[in-house]
């Protein structure tokens, strides 16, 4: 387990990617970080000054881990049990390890007495992410008081000057603390040139806005019993980076300190520690009896500080090396900027090493609609053909019930309880969408439960089928624990139970996969089928689309980490609260948008039993009508089936509705038309951009057959980006949103209630009407 996404660990992964022989053989490696982007500290002052964008200052840990074959776990580390060899994480079970490497960075050593404005403590500069969020609050021209007098405080003050603030430094002593007399003199000259005031011997109670007072390691390291430096809390190691008296535990970067050669926290030493850490992790696993490689870091590290470019002529920099100080000059800035750029390019250029197009996972790994429905149609036909004739009385023998339901529903009704409630069951599952087994199980469970929520049911129990990769028994135990804990993380808040299951060991390199059988109950009168839709119904989509294309691009290293973070945050939101809300506002048909995309699942709703796609509509669209022989029947069941002689599959009406037509229509039913407002259909961040670039899930081409509906019962009111929006309509979803049909007069109130419940991205996207012409979307 690599705890933390610091510079040493990032370089370690890059080394493993470029030189796989350096990676310990037959080892599952997991990296844990609170953020999916590791900010490179050397570029942060330029970011504060406005010289760089935030996207240019980070290392994409999602992509780096994926390319290096490392499991990425995004979580806050809360503690360490060194005896049980477990790393404790926030809100999820601990991770057990055989080897542990600590590179968790540092936090600001102290925060001062408080802000003059609010009385709250000064904002620490470390961790960097909360500080950068704070940076957006003050208005340009505001006075920003910074407690601190080291190199970081000086560079930050100059960057804030360039940003338009009025910084002041609060010094604990009489002067700066830049490591040498020459550096202190040059630092004071830079600050005086920028008219940045110094408050010498500032009282500890003096109000400050920012704290930049040095760093110390997170306190949970000392709480775990590890040996630490008393002043900084950094974990004490020997020359091999192994923690003193703790075999198999290593520490590097700002949280580690070689006891025999202490050096201040600096990115220079963090970078140079990476080859040593790589060698010793490999040696400790593959050659546990061999001595570890020692390292003695250089005595001094070059420091290059930028002035933020506050004055005309462009940014400058100064250089400190031991007792020497040089600058300021523009060429020193160009040198510094080049060093930083080349460091980050080592990681950005790894995108070219992404594998060629790979089959998508999650719900995009499901079978496409064509072969699925073809097999079911043949199964039904085979069952009918196998009914034996019984002589002259055979004509009077009742036909057997259908092998499969004529209209596929999200969940099957298996029984009716004594109180009239319906007992429902559904099954779902797929190969792991993400490498983190706990998160993958959580996503799979939410995805499976949505079939019951779309049917108006609550979830009561689940059984699991877990396929584990071939591995050592202890590792399989850990993977199974993490998987079942992820399932429980969804079920426990619902009051549902994991009542059983089965395990398999995969063969031929098969990875982790999870399937779930989900059981639930729908209150009397609440069961929602997929249809029929009724004229006047308004369609509510309860969330954004785009997970398919995002994870397809992520597999190739083309999705930005913040896009994946946003998608996973949305996908982990339980839709259970929507059941009561939609019921209260008269929901009468519902489905969840999953593998076949919005168009495919809306097509199922249109084809569901009742006056959905009337025969007249089908004939005008060139679809084949089949008389199922139910004379006088009032139910029309339309399903996707193969049309004889056609290369593709089209909707086929398998029944006829009698007496439902309007006057002058010859008794034929009027067709239903759905008008979709594409401007109202939400997209996850990054989804439309990727679709415009040509990215698509591997299931999307098969889903493309649903685009034929746009030539028939579904009309689009298009906004801009028509190509991307059409592609979004067939994008397969994992943990996709519910799509509900509501009475027009209650749809607006229902939407407001859904927004209040936390589903801010829900929208009214369509309206159902009779007739072939596009109609207004939103109810009056």
Question: What are these model-predicted stretches?
Answer:
Residues 255-285, 290-308:
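A conserved FAD-binding loop/helix module that cradles the flavin
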Residues 118-141, 206-272:
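FAD-site-proximal beta/loop scaffold in flavoenzymes
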Residues 309-354:
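C-terminal auxiliary extensions adjacent to catalytic cores
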Residues 67-147, 210:
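FAD-binding core/adjacent interface of flavoenzyme oxidoreductases
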């Amino acid at each position: 387990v690599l705890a933390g996404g610091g510079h040493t660990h990032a370089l370690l992964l890059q080394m493993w990617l470029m030189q796989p022989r350096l990676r310990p053989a037959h080892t599952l490696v997991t990296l844990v970080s609170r953020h999916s982007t590791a900010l490179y500290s050397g570029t942060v002052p330029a970011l504060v000054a406005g010289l760089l964008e935030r996207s240019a200052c980070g290392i994409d840990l999602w992509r780096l881990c994926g390319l290096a074959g490392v499991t990425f776990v995004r979580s806050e580390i809360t503690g360490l049990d060194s005896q049980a060899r477990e790393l404790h994480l926030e809100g999820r079970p601990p991770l057990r390890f055989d080897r542990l490497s600590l590179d968790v960075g540092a936090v600001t050593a102290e925060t001062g007495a408080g802000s003059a404005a609010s009385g709250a403590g000064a904002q620490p500069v470390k961790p960097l992410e909360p500080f950068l969020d704070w940076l957006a609050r003050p208005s340009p021209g505001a006075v920003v008081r910074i407690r601190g007098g080291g190199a970081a405080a000086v560079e930050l003050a100059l960057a804030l000057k360039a940003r338009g603030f009025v910084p002041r430094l609060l010094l604990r002593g009489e002067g700066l603390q830049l490591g040498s007399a020459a550096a202190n003199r040059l630092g004071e000259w830079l600050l005086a040139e920028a008219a940045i005031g110094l408050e010498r011997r500032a009282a500890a109670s003096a109000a400050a806005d920012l704290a930049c007072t040095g760093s110390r390691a997170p306190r949970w390291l000392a709480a775990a019993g590890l040996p630490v430096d008393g002043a900084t809390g950094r974990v004490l190691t020997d020359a091999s980076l192994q923690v003193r008296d703790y075999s198999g535990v290593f520490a590097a970067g700002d949280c580690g300190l070689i006891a025999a050669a202490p050096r201040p926290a600096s990115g220079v030493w963090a970078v140079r520690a990476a080859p040593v850490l790589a060698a010793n992790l490999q040696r400790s696993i593959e050659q546990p009896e061999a001595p570890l490689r020692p390292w003695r870091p250089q005595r001094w590290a070059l420091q290059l500080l930028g002035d933020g470019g506050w004055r005309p002529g462009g940014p400058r920099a100064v250089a400190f090396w031991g007792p020497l100080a040089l600058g300021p000059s523009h060429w020193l800035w160009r040198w510094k900027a080049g060093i930083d750029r080349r460091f980050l390019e080592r990681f950005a250029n790894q995108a070219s090493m992404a594998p060629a197009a790979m089959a998508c996972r999650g719900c995009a790994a499901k079978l496409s609609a064509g072969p699925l429905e073809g097999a079911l149609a043949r199964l039904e036909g085979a069952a009918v053909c196998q009914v034996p004739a019984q002589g002259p009385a055979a004509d009077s023998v009742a036909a057997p019930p259908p092998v499969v339901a004529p209209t596929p529903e999200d969940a099957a009704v298996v029984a009716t309880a004594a109180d009239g409630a319906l007992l429902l069951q559904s099954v779902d599952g797929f190969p792991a969408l993400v490498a983190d087994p706990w998160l993958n199980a959580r996503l799979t469970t939410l995805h499976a439960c949505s079939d019951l929520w779309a049917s108006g049911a609550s979830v009561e129990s689940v059984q699991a089928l877990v396929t584990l990769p071939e591995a050592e028994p202890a590792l399989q135990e850990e993977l199974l624990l993490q998987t079942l804990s992820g399932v429980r993380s969804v079920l426990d808040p619902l009051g549902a139970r994991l009542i059983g299951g089965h395990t398999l060991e995969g063969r031929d390199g098969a990875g982790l996969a999870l399937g779930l059988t989900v059981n639930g109950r729908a209150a009397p009168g609440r069961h929602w089928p997929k249809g029929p839709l009724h004229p006047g119904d308004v369609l509510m989509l309860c969330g954004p689309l785009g997970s398919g294309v995002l994870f397809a691009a992520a597999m190739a290293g083309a999705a930005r980490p913040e896009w994946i973070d946003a998608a996973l945050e949305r996908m982990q939101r339980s839709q259970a609260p929507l059941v009561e809300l939609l019921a209260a506002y008269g929901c009468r048909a519902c489905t969840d948008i999953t593998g076949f995309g919005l168009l495919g699942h809306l097509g199922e709703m249109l084809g569901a039993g009742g006056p959905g796609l009337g025969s007249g509509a089908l004939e005008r669209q060139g679809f084949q009508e089949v008389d199922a022989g139910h004379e006088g029947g009032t139910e029309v069941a339309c399903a996707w089936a193969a049309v004889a002689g056609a290369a593709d599959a089209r909707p086929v009406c398998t029944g006829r509705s009698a007496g439902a037509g309007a006057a002058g229509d010859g008794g034929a039913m009027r067709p239903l038309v759905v008008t979709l407002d594409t401007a109202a259909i939400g997209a996850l961040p990054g989804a439309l951009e990727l679709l415009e670039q040509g990215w698509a899930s591997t299931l999307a081409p098969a889903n493309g057959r649903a685009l034929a509906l746009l030539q028939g019962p579904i009309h689009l009111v298009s906004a801009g980006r028509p190509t991307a929006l059409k592609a979004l309509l067939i994008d397969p979803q994992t943990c996709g949103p519910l799509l509900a049909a509501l009475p027009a007069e209650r749809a607006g109130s229902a939407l407001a209630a859904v927004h209040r419940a936390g589903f801010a991205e829900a929208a009214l996207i369509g309206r159902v009407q009779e007739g072939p012409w596009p109609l207004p979307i939103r109810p009056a």
